[in-house]
Amino acid sequence: MLGDNALFASAYGNVGSSIYYALGLVAALALGLTPVVFILTGALFYFTATTYAEATAMYPEAGGSSLFARQAFNEFWSFFTAWAQMLNYVITIAISAFFAAHYAGGVSWDYFSTSPGDIVFGVALIALLALVNVRGVKDAVSVNIVLAVIDFMSQLALVLAGLFLVFNPEVLSQNMSFLGTAPTWKDFLIAIPLGTVAYTGIETISNMAGEAKEEAKTIPASIKRVMIAVFAIYFTLPWIALSALPVRCGGDGSCTTLLGVPKEDGGYASDPILGIVENMALGPLQGAAEVYVAVLAVTILVAATNAGVLGVSRLTYSMGIHRQMPDSLRRLHPHFRTPYIGILVFSALACVALLPGQAEFLGLIYAFGAMLSFSMAHLALIRLRVTEPDVPRPYRSPGRLRVRGHDLPPLAVLGVLGTLLSFGVISALNVSVAAAGSGWLLLGMLLYVVYRRRQGLDLVSTHKVAIPEPVVDHEAEYDSVLVPVSDGYDEHVMATATKLAARKRRGIHVVSFVTVPHALPISAPLPDEEAAAQSVLEQARIQGGRRVSGHLERIRPGQAGRRIVEEASDMRAAAIVLALPQRIDGASLFGKTLETVLAERPCRVVIESTPPPAATVKRRRAIERAGAAP
């Protein structure tokens, strides 16, 4: 279970990473008004964060704005919101990988700092992380906390150093005196929604709500911490940046800041934080500081890319469970138990989005999806205040607004006005972004309609994949149960596993071992043994129903214990159910197996003590004799 610190670290790891690229993207358009843009987008972030805090505390389940839309409206709007979220995740993956390449190139090989090196680096990174997530990774909470603290303290140190070394109010005042010409009103208005890319990751805490400890307290508390940390950096660092890299105007009237100029033209748009450090007089610490910032940026951005892939994995599975997309996309890998098809498909889309190498376009596309999902979150909270006024709210968004007898959240009202206005600005002033974003939404809605019709479902009702309730409510319950089988089917073991499984859909995974003697190649055909192992899986599915999944595993004699431990770790099992071994002539195949499992267990081990039938004992003797062969 996750507490305040873990939730804060996970969220700030995502939100804090975006400053490494958002600063350059915004400065390219807003020029000297970049700090003002971050203050305005910070207000939107505050409104949105309070909405997420109230709604997530009400419904402490994974899902974020998609869950809020389901509770407030219906399944169609839940899908619409989830599909916008998916766009956010895809773009987060692409843009984080893209800028990781540029920071890496800043202190290593220049090839990665320019096209096509940045694209090659980004695509390779996405492909690697997609494969890693197919293999299955766990969120390392302690690592997240350490990275978040290091990141925040480093950014804070940069702000403090900048205040003493480069901060110049006179320069900043001059930077802000060109509104209407530098930046133009159009660029300034576009920069505001683009600035929301600085707040990627607000969904993180909401999606981890199901893992939170005392969610009524920890979720609002962690969101408040994120807001404080974000404002401490985002409301100060842009002033330092514009002092170090001020706006300069040429004889033709055009104005620029190196903060928003591409690297090819001598600027720092692709690595703005590194640019700030390079333009500080740090003396003997200069070189070390530049390397430190670049390495930290690459580390944080790689972690953000991985967080995006993890988000795709979770969202794909959630949408599949709620019948919002074809089952094939949420299909779990037979060995690694991850939605591998969804991970590979949406990671491939992130690679496609990266190919043009247009960072500003990626940022605006992110803003397109984010403004939609944030708007739906605000609208959902407003509607829930009307339709569900009596639902307990451990946290309430500040302020009160009485309208026709209803107590509405004023910050959510301001938030939806701001996000919808920003969405309108993006769509009206950038046709290519509007076309790409609308195409994504239309494709998603078409897939949704076709899929639901083929399933015989309407578009608005919630139809979740059947997950039966626990068999008994007084037994210990586990999220997943591993049942390894080597000596024939045992219905008593399966019955015990059924009682322990809390999630009945794929909540029980059966591994049926086929033991291959040392004298034969591991891939040698063993039709009888394979048929018997397959029969075990079929009997398990008959007894356990759709809750059961499984696969065959070829092993050598004596390897069962190790494979059980590895399988339990890979699938993140919370319990292993084994039959109690019977001693035969002083030894037993499963005697060694059980000793290995108990010695190296990654989770709780439950032993079923029902004696095996005589046929099983006879088969064990035969296996032992075969295993003894050299």
Name what the model sees in each region:
Residues 12-23, 61, 81-101, 194-212, ...:
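Membrane-helix boundary/coupling elements in multi-pass transport proteins
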Residues 21-121, 156, 229, 236:
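Extracellular loop-to-transmembrane helix junctions
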Residues 113, 145-218, 223-290:
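Helix-loop-helix junctions that connect adjacent transmembrane segments
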Residues 117-168, 223-227, 363-377, 431-445:
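Membrane-interface loop-to-helix entry segments
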Residues 328-338, 375-427:
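C-terminal membrane-solvent junction of multi-pass transporters and transport-like membrane proteins
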Residues 360, 364-365, 369-370, 402-459:
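A generic transmembrane alpha-helix motif of multi-pass inner-membrane proteins
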Residues 473-527, 548-552, 600, 607-610, ...:
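Small/aliphatic-rich secondary-structure junction motif
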Residues 578-599, 614-615:
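Glycine-rich, Arg-bearing micro-motifs that act as flexible, cationic patches
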